[in-house]
UniProtKB/Swiss-Prot annotation:
Entry keyword Transmembrane: yes
UniProt keywords, alphabetically: Cell membrane, Membrane, Transmembrane, Transmembrane helix
Parts of the chain that traverse the membrane: 162-182, 239-259
Taxonomic lineage from the root: Bacteria, Bacillati, Actinomycetota, Actinomycetes, Mycobacteriales
Entry GO MF terms: oxidoreductase activity
Mode of membrane association: Multi-pass membrane protein
Source species: Mycobacterium tuberculosis (strain CDC 1551 / Oshkosh)
Cellular component, GO, one term: plasma membrane
Name this protein carries in UniProt: Uncharacterized protein MT0908
Subcellular location: Cell membrane
The keyword Metal-binding is annotated on this UniProt entry: no
Pfam assignment, any one: AurF
Amino acid sequence: MDRTRIVRRWRRNMDVADDAEYVEMLATLSEGSVRRNFNPYTDIDWESPEFAVTDNDPRWILPATDPLGRHPWYQAQSRERQIEIGMWRQANVAKVGLHFESILIRGLMNYTFWMPNGSPEYRYCLHESVEECNHTMMFQEMVNRVGADVPGLPRRLRWVSPLVPLVAGPLPVAFFIGVLAGEEPIDHTQKNVLREGKSLHPIMERVMSIHVAEEARHISFAHEYLRKRLPRLTRMQRFWIALYFPLTMRSLCNAIVVPPKAFWEEFDIPREVKKELFFGSPESRKWLCDMFADARMLAHDTGLMNPIARLVWRLCKIDGKPSRYRSEPQRQHLAAAPAA
């Protein structure tokens, strides 16, 4: 009897037709995917001379928004070394992105497999899957053009990646929290790079611009999906989800943002530099906290920021003020200039 009740509740949660506002939001996102979408081989002119990847191109030097790019150790390296490190780093970020999106695509396929006929979520999830497939092709083409043999995600996460998408069917709330934990750091980092206005290599600039434009829809869907489902959970489920939320955010952030072991060995980067970069200095800790301002807003708005959850956010070192609105730029307050 209990098992039957659980299955009925699970199926009932899949039906969203009674929520007109949510259905309208899904229609808007789906129409946006039809009107504005990108193809990696028609919207990026890979063979253009402008997109050629050449040695000693200073546009591959890491920007100041990258924690390594603003570190004194990196800035003390020769220009050639900075370029080499920058190319490897950016190629690995792209490889991490395609690994994560491959997991996301498989999870969305598992989730939509169980949807009832007529579900508006089905259409949008398929639109998102198509866009993510294009992103993986785009990221892999960038890696191939750069020519660095980068590993992407840490080995342990690559090993368990076939299992993660299986969560999406029976535990969709946990899965979509994981989706945000992967999408938010990448999106935050790329937006900061584009906002900085530094001269970037055309491949990197175009790939980032396309990814940020389409990822806005994907993150919006994940946020609205959770806003709808979280209030339906039982009190005990909400308690455990409130703890799972920050733990997942921090663990996936580490896997996505921190370069793999091969990077530190390849360029013989001192251990103390790594410790300071991730996340031992005040600047790097602020950068870490800023990534999850939108996630904290979601936790606040859905009642997941209880006293114990606040402690877990603090222990994970990703606590702080929530965003006032999604994608609010996180700016440093400038010190007032001394009077003349």
